[in-house]
A protein has these predicted regions:
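Phosphate-handling catalytic cores of nucleic-acid transaction enzymes
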Residues: 1-454
Length: 454
């Protein structure tokens, strides 16, 4: 254990990181120091920062690297992420920090694009009135390459991805705006496109306003944004849990996080303030420099030890799923966990390579263990969010009615339980319908109900 590792361990213990549940120790030592520095100097939440860094690294890597899950099943690090928290707890600043190096690259690209566009327009202007034989040769039509998008229509998103086949990131402060956009375009199959994109399947876009239909054979779209606890239930109300879209998201929802008091940083610690920005830029720059060529796949395999760990972990979950005899009780989210976890393993391997702690020849056991622990954290966060929807978005008394019933019950039992709390039969029937729509309970053809096990 070197000096930095000891220092990080002591700082983590002093900061109470262990009580948060996030496995900060799975990150490279250089990144642990950076995350703890930001918590001290910028009041950033350790959990929001760590998650934002994972998302930004995935965006920087894009389609330049793949991981082989098994056989011919390979995937690039496509991650959909939501940061959940009450207003004012600082969800956005860590996200802005993580994506700043990519924002800076986009700013540079925009300046280059404007210069090339002006040059192109000037040549066109000079050619006016000249004979064709006297024309100056025109350079290729300038095209703007963007890594990050925050305001778009489905067509613009896919057009940009068609230009930047390495990948694009949808980074939005309030993610409800994105979900509202998706909901608005539901009839045009945008939801299905985003589901396919997360699976790494080809995405086709055919619109009457497109000169040529678009086809992205190997999509790599990152989605990340924040949401306030008070409106999380709207994601469920809009049907994003039911259609499986929400199942694909990694959730970070810190336990009992409150607004941190501002603390004055001594002047002698100025170097600490600057260090995280320098270190993170170096890491992202290494990831961005990874070569990408359309149609050529740089695939990292698991090491023998890593694949044993990954498969044993997955097979344990398969056993749990197979033990469920009632298909209605199977959680659809469970099927997405191994894919996201494999992608996390790839990211952690590249984190360690970028921090000079490892290589990028294959994904080793340490990265797989890191991914499994991080995946477990995300699933526990999701469970907290799920519980939040039930408790915050539901009338407390109505929740008590549901809690008073067994895991399986019939309408008559629900009506009786509702009457005990002063609800009329009609109100109870509306209540049951609402619980079904929120996927809290399931109703079979015989009119029997069963609680969904979270």
């Amino acid at each position: 254990m070197d000096a930095l590792e000891i220092c990080n361990k002591l700082r983590s213990e002093a900061s109470g990181v262990a009580t948060s549940g996030i496995p900060l120790d799975v990150f490279p030592q250089k990144m642990q120091q950076m995350i703890l520095d930001l918590a001290r100097t910028e009041n950033y939440s350790v959990e929001f920062t760590a998650t934002s860094l994972i998302s930004a690294m995935a965006a920087a890597v894009g389609n330049s690297c793949y991981i082989r899950i098994k056989g011919n099943w390979i995937t690039s690090p496509i991650l959909y992420v939501i940061l959940v928290g009450r207003p004012g707890v600082g969800k956005t600043p860590p996200l802005n920090f993580a994506y700043k190096p990519l924002h800076d690259i986009d700013t540079e690209e925009h300046h280059k694009f404007k210069a090339l566009k002006n040059e192109y327009a000037a040549i066109v202007e000079r050619n006016k009135g000249k004979k064709r034989t006297e024309w100056e040769s025109l350079p290729p039509v300038p095209v703007l390459h963007k890594n990050i998008m925050n305001d778009f229509t489905p067509e613009i998103l896919m057009r940009n991805h068609d230009v930047n086949l390495r990948g694009v990131a949808v980074v939005v402060d309030e993610i409800m705006g994105l979900f509202n956009t998706i909901n608005r375009y539901n009839n045009s199959s945008f939801v299905q496109q985003m589901l396919s994109a997360h699976n790494g399947l080809p995405v086709d876009v055919s619109r009457c306003n497109l000169d040529c239909p678009l086809r992205i054979d190997y999509p790599c779209i990152q989605i990340v944004g924040t949401i306030q606890t008070g409106i999380v239930h709207e994601l469920y109300d809009m049907g994003f849990k039911k259609n499986g879209f929400l199942d694909r998201f990694l959730i970070t929802y810190p336990k009992g996080l409150k607004i941190a008091p501002w603390v004055k940083v001594p002047k002698q610690d100025a170097a600490i303030i600057e260090r995280p920005f320098r270190v993170w830029k170096e890491i992202i720059d290494k990831a961005v420099a990874l070569p990408f060529t359309e149609g050529i796949f740089n695939v990292l395999d698991f090491s023998d030890e890593a694949i044993d760990i990954f498969y044993d972990w997955q097979n344990e979950d398969i056993e749990r799923q197979n033990a469920i005899t009632d298909e209605k009780m199977i959680d659809s989210r469970a099927a997405k966990v191994p894919l996201n976890t494999a992608r996390l393993a790839l990211i952690f391997q590249l984190f360690r390579w970028a921090c000079d702690e490892s290589h990028k020849d294959f994904v080793d056991a340490e990265s797989v263990n890191a991914a499994i622990r991080m995946s477990d954290y995300f699933e526990k966060s999701y469970k907290r969010m799920d519980d939040l929807v039930l408790t915050e978005a539901t009338d407390p008394v109505k929740k008590q009615v549901l809690d008073s019933l067994g895991n399986k019950f019939v309408t008559a039992e629900a009506v009786k339980a509702g009457a005990d709390f002063g609800f009329a039969r009609r109100t109870v029937m509306y209540m049951l319908k609402d619980f079904c729509q929120r996927n809290f309970i399931i109703k079979d053809k015989q009119g029997n109900y069963e609680k969904v096990q979270k």
